Amino acid sequence: MSFKDLREFIDHLEQKGRLKRITHPVDPAYEMTEISDRTLRAGGPALLFENPIGYNVPVLTNLFGTPERVAIGMGREDVKELREVGKLLAYLKEPEPPKGFKDALEKLPVFKQVLNMPAKRLRKAPCQDIVWQGDEVDLDKIPVMSCWAEDVAPLLTWGLTVTKGPNKKRQNLGIYRQQKIAKNKIIMRWLAHRGGALDLRDWMETNPGKPFPVSVAFGADPATILGAVTPVPDTLSEYAFAGLLRGSKTEVVKSISNDLEVPASAEIVMEGYIDPNEFADEGPYGDHTGYYNEKEKHHVFTITHITMRKDPIYHSTYTGRPPDEPAVLGVALNEVFVPILQKQFPEIEDFYLPPEGCSYRMAVVTMKKQYPGHAKRVMMGVWSFLRQFMYTKFVIVCDESVNARDWNDVVKAMTEHMDPVRDTLMIDNTPIDSLDFASPVVGLGSKMGLDATIKWDAELATRPQISKQDSKVITEADLESLKQQRPEIIDIYLPPTTNNRFAVVTMKKDQAGQSQALMEYLWDFFAQYTDNKFVILCDEDVNARDWNDIIWAVTTRMDPDRDTTRVSGKAESSSKLGLDATNKFESEVTREWGTPIKKDPKLVAKVDEIWDQLGIL
């Protein structure tokens, strides 16, 4: 199953009941976000808004709003088949020569796929049916979405940004958010380690002061779009990978104003340049973390040409607290990552990036442990092997018998097999996502590795295993009494698999230092009943019994080193870790804390009024 362009993909989804056309007039300012968010959270279809208020261009959202649609876009029938995509990428990253004639025959299907890799260059293409240039260039004619009430400006989200470094043979495709600031100008927000930013850096070194050519394509075929978000080897272009997924060469055409090649079937293409000396303040925007980010200086992209197909479709999305479309993509791409990691670390049984952890800030790994210290080697491997995991703050490693995708199973392993202080690896001053406001410094923070594997004798030398102790039953009456003694406590959850040695507590936090004081009180309380090892403190907006809420709070509101309390063990009791996943007061941190995204009640009520008319679900 493959699709030559976005329109063919739309037709297929519509035939299968996976896309809904919305004929009711809908405003790109906020309304589309609210409708798309409701639809995605309900596992609903892709949406094609045919009558955006004030515009003649339809808007496509929620295209990859379920893992199944991501798999279909990659030419697969089922999400599980994405493991085969990962195996192919692992092979291309480190190809093995055939061991003989029989092995060569077995590898023949792979070689045939590789033949589809080079892009096919066209002289004319649908994406250049209509051309705007000079004063005709006008972003106000395109229904760019405004997503959240406190966003600074409309935001372009799904553009495939095409760049080429001066010393590179191939182009780079990347997806970066872009703030609209004028009819012909947007701010290009790309992080320093991303391909586009690296190409610009190299360009400025070899062509100081000269404009850097850039093209941005919206609405390419699904294989090309997904190729831009997949961890392809550095030696393989995204166009080539898209050809592998599709089973046919990716058709491209040279941009009108520069030498960059863009997808021939793209709906809309923006061409222009970045002046190395032109910057602007980007943000704040509500982001995939569920918070508004800080302002940052980024380069400005000046658009000199806009080309498009006849009757173009504008492809867009929104980002917000998981689940959103990036989180769904993360769930699907997780299956691609597993074989790539297993090629380098065959001992890995499973690898899971929970979407509630913003799809990259936490990883759970299960493995076949073969020697002392093996779990820590795997932690280091996760952090260093793929660029995608550079910003993963927490890595939990468990034995192969543990279900990495079941939090009750994971915390059971943590309480049974960890001495928390001994088996926790903390690394300071490591690269961190600049959107992570919990880090002490922009772009720099700590990482935590938790070894929840069964320990070998050598690993017990510094801290012998504490013999299992019987736990007294903690009754609801006991917990109610605790709440009366500490009225700031909202709820207490003791996961049933942890024998009362793991607690999640939500609280009403009123002042700095309050969470640390409560943590100490809780350990004294639990000591009456059990050898408690872990306490996680969260704010009252978190449901203590919902792992989605808990993991989201841990990954967005903690710097692991600063916000973890360590208590050394005693002869008769284990060491302890306290994780403070509460929002921090100004005196507790060194930079501005994030503001959570909140929906506008008036907007919600307005969409409520038309929801049934839309007939989406």
Swiss-Prot record:
Its cofactor is a divalent metal cation. GO terms for cellular component: cytosol; plasma membrane. Gene3D superfamilies: Single helix bin, UbiD C-terminal domain-like. It is found in: Cell membrane. Its EC number is 4.1.1.-. One of its GO terms (biological process) is ubiquinone biosynthetic process. It is a peripheral membrane protein. Homohexamer. Catalyzes the decarboxylation of 3-octaprenyl-4-hydroxy benzoate to 2-octaprenylphenol. PANTHER family: 3-OCTAPRENYL-4-HYDROXYBENZOATE CARBOXY-LYASE-RELATED (PTHR30108), FERULIC ACID DECARBOXYLASE 1 (PTHR30108:SF17). This is 3-octaprenyl-4-hydroxybenzoate carboxy-lyase. It comes from Vibrio parahaemolyticus serotype O3:K6 (strain RIMD 2210633).
